[in-house]
């Protein structure tokens, strides 16, 4: 367990995502092998990082479990960079985001840190999806639009403003770009979850699970050889 002195990520779903996503994807890879395995390797340190992202930097060295997680993530991260040098860009961006959190918090501009985190995550998807054989341009834009909804959701909970939840209707219209983008309609569940939840951690758990569903969905499409852009061109024909 993570030391109680640490500020555990408010998402609280990092561990859920880490365990489930790789349990499912490994099973899929056994059925059909391909370079998607490289994408899975790349995402291991990302999800390990999510699990401790909001931990207090000054106290991290006091927790042997967190140190072990960072060590494993670093080893796998190096292997990922050997697979594709572009991965180095995303890892460096994540590190900059992690260590700049105290500064942005001090000047009360944490939204900059959050925006950089979204860009880093979308960039990660762009690299891995391209590596898996999918042109990820449209998907990356749609993913960014979906992730912005997470911030509206958290703000809605903190400020008790249900109006902010209305943004989560926007991802539903991504289906106009591609019929397979219907998966982003999962954002509607944010509305119900936020209204029913009495603690932010439940909203965070739901958010992590929703992201997990999207990741697994895209990986399955990759293994099935479905090109999202080709499907989109047929849709608009």
Please describe what each predicted stretch is:
Residues 35-73:
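Glycine/small-residue-rich interface belts in oligomeric ring/scaffold proteins
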Residues 2-5, 49-61, 96-110, 148-163, ...:
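C-terminal ends of transmembrane helices
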Residues 23-41, 75-89, 123-141, 174-180, ...:
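Helix-coil boundary and interhelical linker segments in multi-pass alpha-helical membrane proteins
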Residues 5-12, 161-237:
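C-terminal transmembrane helix-loop-helix hairpin of multi-pass membrane proteins
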Residues 1-43:
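N-terminal signal-anchor module of multipass membrane proteins
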Residues 89-165:
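Membrane-proximal helix-loop-helix units in multi-pass membrane proteins
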Residues 57-65, 79-85, 110-111:
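Helix-loop junctions on the outward
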Residues 19-23, 67-77, 115-129, 165-176, ...:
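Small-residue-rich segments of transmembrane alpha-helices in multi-pass membrane proteins
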């Amino acid at each position: 367990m993570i030391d109680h002195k640490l500020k555990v990520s408010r998402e609280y779903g990092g561990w859920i995502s880490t365990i489930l996503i790789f349990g499912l994807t490994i099973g899929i890879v056994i059925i059909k092998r391909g370079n998607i395995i490289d994408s899975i390797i790349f995402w291991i340190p990302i999800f390990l990082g999510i699990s401790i992202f909001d931990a207090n930097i000054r106290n991290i060295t006091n927790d042997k479990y967190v140190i072990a997680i960072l060590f494993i993530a670093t080893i796998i991260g190096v292997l990922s960079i050997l697979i594709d040098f572009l991965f180095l860009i995303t890892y460096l961006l994540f590190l900059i985001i992690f260590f700049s959190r105290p500064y942005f918090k001090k000047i009360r501009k944490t939204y900059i840190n959050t925006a950089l985190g979204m860009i880093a995550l979308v960039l990660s998807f762009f690299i891995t999806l391209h590596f898996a054989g999918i042109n990820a341009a449209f998907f990356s834009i749609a993913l960014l639009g979906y992730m912005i909804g997470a911030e509206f959701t958290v703000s809605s909970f903190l400020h008790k403003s249900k109006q902010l939840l209305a943004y989560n209707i926007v991802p539903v219209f991504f289906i106009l770009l591609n019929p397979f983008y219907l998966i982003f309609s999962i954002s509607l569940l944010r509305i119900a979850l936020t209204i029913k939840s009495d603690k932010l951690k439940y909203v965070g758990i739901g958010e992590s699970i929703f992201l997990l569903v999207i990741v697994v969905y895209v990986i399955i499409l990759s293994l099935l050889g479905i090109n999202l852009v080709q499907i989109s061109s047929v849709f608009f024909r």
